[in-house]
Regions:
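Extended amphipathic alpha-helical segments with heptad-repeat/coiled-coil character used for oligomerization
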Residues: 300-342
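N-terminal mature-domain region immediately after signal-peptide cleavage
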Residues: 22-273, 280-285, 292-315, 344-479
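Bacterial Sec-dependent N-terminal signal peptides
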Residues: 1-33
Length: 479
């Protein structure tokens, strides 16, 4: 009996010890300890379902972090291994470089709340014998803004133009309301475009109940304190998603990391205005996006196009707004991107044509079912053909002989749509959304035959074996 009680206390003791000891070069990264009899896992849970890992995280920032690190320890470990391997190959920067960035200009910009949560994740990992610290978790959360915004800036300093087309082409999305939807209320959908070696890990559904702010339900990668791709609904009726801005260039190391602004906008926004304000406060230009935002309380939707120097907002209670990695504001395009507005053969512009036609044709019919159809669509509006390539909403660059030059991806690069989500105002009020892991069209990616056909990508086989497609699944936050 004494041995059993000791085993029960081990996670608690490990958590208390780690949180009290964890530190960075400049400060103690957490001074919080918890009472010896408190179980940080008491309110947490985990469930595997149709390719997703659902986790319920609840409590103080330290508790939420510990629950996250403990319950997803293996997934975080595997993700960091794959990510560090991928980044070293593609950006020519090793994991030590990204940790150094976290130390030099990210950690000190974080709010105490998020430092405590990150320290908690590291504590949970240590309790499961995974040797990562707060710098690893910070670098993981900032992977997009560091690898594809900061590193290209360094490249340009060495050779002008060498950092062009490095901003990723992540995602297709829409948000609609009013006469465009079946019930006149908001419908929102998003599919995630990512390199498969990374995108296969974007398979967490995080149900987060913090001590302060909104209850959040979102998809994310293991170890993320934000959604990252992004798709999040909140208990206050705020819905947020995005697509990246192709050809964007700009990064300010003195600003607040994008991953904190994204998390904070979901956790503390009560209105569309709040989301816009939080994203603009301390903006570092990292992971520059067109943010699609909805408020179920007012039935209004908005698009926030946010660069580093420029931003613009569009709002309406009767519209369908789309995103496929194209910027819209002429000033932002001219000032901060290399985007080719008139190149209709590019992935962003071809998908824009298709999505505009779909939301017009489906006016008055948009709901979960039609949203799922949009995310799985395979019609190339530029070539007027049904096909698997870079120009379709459910992207398959791994089958495109031309690759995707606008994102600096060569022919047949294993990248495309890796998962999807959709919800309605009524579902969101109950903290529910539908999610699909793997290509929304239902097609599997199997590594062995792919590497045989395209041996230039066999280096990825170490961490990318397959990416299976699963059924659409309804997820619901715990009440």
């Amino acid at each position: 009996m004494k041995q059993f009680k000791l085993r029960q206390l081990l996670p608690v003791l490990a958590f208390s010890f780690f949180i009290s000891c964890q530190s960075s070069d400049k400060e103690k990264t957490s001074k919080e300890t918890i009472p010896a009899k408190t179980d940080p896992l008491a309110k947490a849970s985990r469930e595997n379902k149709n390719g997703w890992v659902y986790v319920h995280l609840e409590g103080s920032p330290s508790d939420i972090g510990y629950q996250h690190g403990y319950l997803l320890s293996n997934e975080i470990d595997t993700t960091i291994q794959a990510l560090s391997y991928y980044l070293e190959h593609e950006t020519k920067k090793d994991w030590a470089f990204y940790r150094q960035c976290a130390r030099n200009f990210l950690w000190d910009k974080l709010d105490r709340e998020y430092k405590d949560e990150i320290n908690g994740i590291a504590a949970g990992l240590h309790a499961k014998q995974k040797n990562y610290d707060s710098l690893d978790i910070t670098a993981l959360n900032a992977m997009e803004e560091l690898a594809f915004y900061y590193v290209p800036q360094l490249m340009d300093k060495e050779k002008a133009g060498s950092g062009d087309n490095k901003a990723p082409g992540n995602c297709s999305a829409f948000i609609a309301t009013g006469s465009y939807t079946k019930d006149g209320k908001i419908v929102i959908g998003h599919n995630n475009w990512t390199e498969y070696i990374i995108g296969q890990h974007w398979n967490v559904i995080a149900d987060v109940v913090p001590e302060k702010g909104n209850h959040m339900l979102m998809d994310c990668m293991p170890g993320f304190i934000h959604s990252g791709d992004d798709f999040v609904i909140t208990s206050n009726g705020i819905l947020i998603t995005e697509t990246t801005i192709t050809g964007f260039k700009g990064f300010d190391t003195t600003g607040i990391p994008e991953f904190q602004r994204a998390r904070k906008s979901a956790q503390y926004s009560n209105s569309i205005d709040d989301v816009i304000r939080i994203f603009n406060t301390g903006n570092n230009g990292g992971y520059a996006n067109d943010w699609l935002i909805g408020d179920t309380k007012t039935n209004e939707v908005a698009k926030l196009e946010l660069g580093l120097k420029d931003y613009r907002v569009w709002r309406s209670k009767d519209t369908a707004m789309i995103g496929s990695n194209f910027p819209s504001d002429p000033k932002l395009i001219a000032d901060e991107t290399t985007f080719k507005v008139n190149d209709k053969s590019s992935s962003p512009n071809a998908r824009k044509m298709r999505m505009e036609k779909l939301v017009t044709n489906l006016k008055g019919k948009l709901d979960v079912e039609t949203g799922e159809q949009i995310e799985a669509d395979h019609y190339d509006a530029y070539h007027n053909v049904k096909i698997n390539n870079k120009c379709v909403i459910c992207g398959h660059i791994d089958e495109d002989k031309n690759g995707c030059a606008e994102w600096d991806l060569p022919a047949y690069y294993p990248m495309g749509a890796v998962q999807g989500k959709v919800t309605t105002a009524d579902l969101a009020k109950d903290m529910k959304f539908w999610a699909h892991m793997g290509h929304p069209c239902g097609q599997d990616f199997i590594g062995a035959p792919f590497y045989k056909l395209h041996p230039q990508y066999a280096w990825q086989a170490k961490y990318l074996v397959e990416m299976k497609s699963y059924p659409w699944t309804l997820f619901e936050a715990k009440k």
